[in-house]
């Protein structure tokens, strides 16, 4: 079972960017931190950098599990990180 590496997290953070005040994304979903969405995100809420980091780590657990459950071939850490980043960005609903 893989876990996302520090480099993988840094890549996600780089492409997501960090917004400490919630905003509506391009499809109208309230988002905060490094791309965190969900019922806990309220309009114009404010979080700290530390809270944004924790939300990202908590969010990634679900995507790590999904990638670990679905990938049935040997992959390396970089490939795993890329798949977690991809699923974090696009979701895992089929």
Residue ranges and their predicted role:
Residues 1-94:
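Cell-wall polysaccharide-cleaving catalytic domain and substrate-binding groove, primarily
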């Amino acid at each position: 079972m893989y876990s996302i590496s520090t480099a993988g997290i840094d890549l996600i953070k780089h492409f997501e960017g960090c917004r400490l005040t919630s905003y509506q994304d391009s499809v109208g979903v309230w988002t905060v931190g490094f791309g965190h969405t969900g019922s806990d995100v309220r309009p114009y809420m404010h979080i700290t950098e530390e809270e944004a980091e924790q939300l990202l780590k908590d969010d990634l657990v679900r995507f790590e599990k999904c990638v670990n459950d679905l990938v049935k071939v040997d992959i390396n850490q970089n490939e795993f990180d890329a798949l977690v980043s991809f699923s974090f960005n696009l979701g895992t609903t089929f």
